[in-house]
Amino acid sequence: MALDWVGNLVSIHCGPTLGVYQGEISSVDQTSQTISLRNPFHNGVKCTVPEVTFSAMDIKDLKILEISKNSIEVSKQNGPESSSTTLMPHVGRKDKGGGGGGGGAPANSAPVMVPNKAEPRLQEGGVSPVPHYSKSYGERHIDMAVQGKGFRRRHNSWSSSCRGPNQATPKKNGLKNGGHMKNKDDECFGDGMDDVLDEDFDFEGNLALFDKAAVLSQIESSERRGNGARSRGTPGEQTPSRYRHDENILEAKPVVYRQITVPQNGSKEYSTDSGLVVPSISFELHKRLLAAAESHGLSLERRLEMTGVCASQMALTLLGGPNRLTPKNVHQRPTVALLCGPHVQGAQGISCGRHLANHEVEVVLFLPNFVKMLEAITSELALFGKTGGRLVSNVKDLPETPVDLVINCLDSHENGFLRDQPWYKAAADWANQNRAPVLSIDPPVSGQAHAVEAKWSLSLGLPLPLSEGAGRVYPCDIGIPRQVFQEVGIKYHSPFGCKFVIPLHSE
């Protein structure tokens, strides 16, 4: 009876101290109640000794992983007329109260079911038809080592690709034919990745280990702890070890959105993209501010230069910026029409046209002929003439086709009678009939409707209370120091940040 167990693959559980051993049964001694395994694996790792022996007192549980072919044939010979299944003996611990017959199986041992004649026999390749769904890595290596007639699959080889899936060439068993050397070759040169690649990943089992509800509740509790920076709290409170990406370690002061206050609130207030409130100022306060800045050294020439730079930067952005002004688009240079009057606002427009012409923009400057011009206009015209831009004094010489942008500098803050001049009306009509968008530089505050409907308006410093016809307001920083604002009664903190021109939103 003991010989029936030889050749079977078993897994022996010896408790938490000794662990689990797996291997092929080499001998069973009923007298001394011992069992020996060859090619053993201890906890999935192959042992260094070729054989280990276990006493029945150390065995907690014994499982049969694979029944050898000889055991099945013996069972069929002993009971051919039996029922569909035959019970195989089970080696376990000796019962404490047992008398004679030391080879008996314990009462609580589970019988092993052996298939009858109707079930399929072993295949020619020596692979057992019994499914092995829960074998460990070490158990599968035992299967590969003890299958005498099995074959080992090789990836990327011609022989395995030419044969069909069931046309395996059986190995020759025995020491004569080099079976022992073949096993050594497999241990030395074999890649253990074949069995790993055949194993399917258990998605459902791993998903069951993830407690999704607990993780979501932890995230929600961390989000409910507070919005913004954490406070220090009382000494008894535990400071959290981790902060969110939008939290500050140091306490932040509350944001003050009204950082600019004026002595007389204008009729309009604006706000920046970050929420800062920018109040408008009257034209009288605007004049006092420019006069105070000029007395401290911010001359008219400096102001014209700063206004021209800021206006040209905004115009270049409106024209397309780096997407339009590239060396590959030399054949598609943008065209800008400048409409200027004989005043300081016109000089600001000429300065803007000079900077645009320096950036490879085709500029057409309209300026009516006057016997006497302001000195600022004369100096700006001299510089503009060196850029290659075109200067016209008649509206008929302006482009007939739509241009890319129209810059309006026709209006003056103080000379409102210019609107009645023929050249002014003709230039305003041309701008309204042209399909190009209009940018107004430093438009005035007047009760009348704007002669030229603008899409954008550029203001110097703090904006004026402009009407809806001025379009969207963009203030520009012309370099007025903070103490100059304080001299005229304005509490000022720069809303520009890292830019010189920012958009404003009407409140």
UniProtKB/Swiss-Prot annotation:
Residues 75-113, 154-182, 220-248 are annotated as: Disordered. It holds the Pfam family Edc3_linker. It is found in: Cytoplasm, P-body. The modification Phosphoserine is found at S128. One of its GO terms (biological process) is deadenylation-independent decapping of nuclear-transcribed mRNA. One of its GO terms (molecular function) is mRNA binding. Residues 189-225 form the DFDF domain. GO terms for cellular component: P-body. The keyword Phosphoprotein applies. InterPro entries: DFDF, FDF_dom, Lsm14-like_N, Lsm16_N, Sm, YjeF_N_dom, YjeF_N_dom_sf. Keywords: Cytoplasm, Phosphoprotein, RNA-binding. Residues 1-68 form the Sm domain. Residues 188-295 are annotated as: Required for interaction with DDX6. Its main location: cytoplasm. It comes from the Eukaryota. Residues 75-87, 157-170 have a biased composition (Polar residues). Signal peptide: none annotated. Residues 282-486 form the YjeF N-terminal domain. Residues 1-77 are annotated as: Required for P-body targeting and interaction with DCP1A. The DFDF domain is unstructured by itself. It assumes a helical fold upon interaction with other proteins. Belongs to the EDC3 family. Binds single-stranded RNA. Involved in the process of mRNA degradation and in the positive regulation of mRNA decapping. This is Enhancer of mRNA-decapping protein 3.
